[in-house]
UniProtKB/Swiss-Prot annotation:
PROSITE patterns the UniProt entry points to: RIBOSOMAL_L5 (PS00358)
Claim: Transcription is one of the keywords in the record: no
Statement: the UniProt record of this protein carries the keyword tRNA processing: no
UniProt-listed Pfam families: Ribosomal_L5 (PF00281), Ribosomal_L5_C (PF00673)
Family of this protein: Belongs to the universal ribosomal protein uL5 family.
Coiled coil: none
Name this protein carries in UniProt: Large ribosomal subunit protein uL5
Keywords recorded for this protein, A-Z: Ribonucleoprotein, Ribosomal protein, RNA-binding, rRNA-binding, tRNA-binding
Annotated Gene Ontology cellular component terms: ribonucleoprotein complex; ribosome
GO molecular function: rRNA binding; structural constituent of ribosome; tRNA binding
Organism expressing this protein natively: Aliivibrio salmonicida (strain LFI1238)
Subunit structure and binding partners: Part of the 50S ribosomal subunit; part of the 5S rRNA/L5/L18/L25 subcomplex. Contacts the 5S rRNA and the P site tRNA. Forms a bridge to the 30S subunit in the 70S ribosome.
InterPro entries assigned: Ribosomal_uL5, Ribosomal_uL5_bac-type, Ribosomal_uL5_C, Ribosomal_uL5_CS, Ribosomal_uL5_dom_sf, Ribosomal_uL5_N
Amino acid sequence: MAKLHDYYKSSVVAELTKEFSYSSVMQVPRVEKITLNMGVGEAINDKKLLENAAADMAIISGQKPLITKARKSVAGFKIREGYPIGCKVTLRGERMWEFLERLVSIALPRVRDFRGVSAKSFDGRGNYSMGVREQIIFPEIDYDKVDRVRGLDITITTSANTDAEGRALLAAFNFPFRK
């Protein structure tokens, strides 16, 4: 079991129950899933770019990504409905906890000029979204084998009802919010 999951069960549940005065431990917010998304618009011209992006995402997440396709045609972007334009991975369970642990303790501190992540990126229902500009902040990615620096979107879906509860949950995991 991941250290962060143990920590959640042993300390965070008690902290949040006390802070928000929940009547049951089932009311305590928990991390339900983490979704990683990488849009590769340039894949229209070069299919190899999408394959490389999917390979990078598989290394980062530990599971095979789903290739996303365009939902509708957009003439301005020269894409047609059904064209492969990105990839995504949904992490749950043990892999989710391990990824969250690596993100907070290893990957985010490796970002250049890092001052913390914005505390305003909550969606109103306790879910947090953030973007990473370079996939090379993850230690699994070999810098010499990267063909192009790509960013990815990370969405952390929680069972929290409000942004305050979601922020308290992520802050309990030492999520580096900007002061």
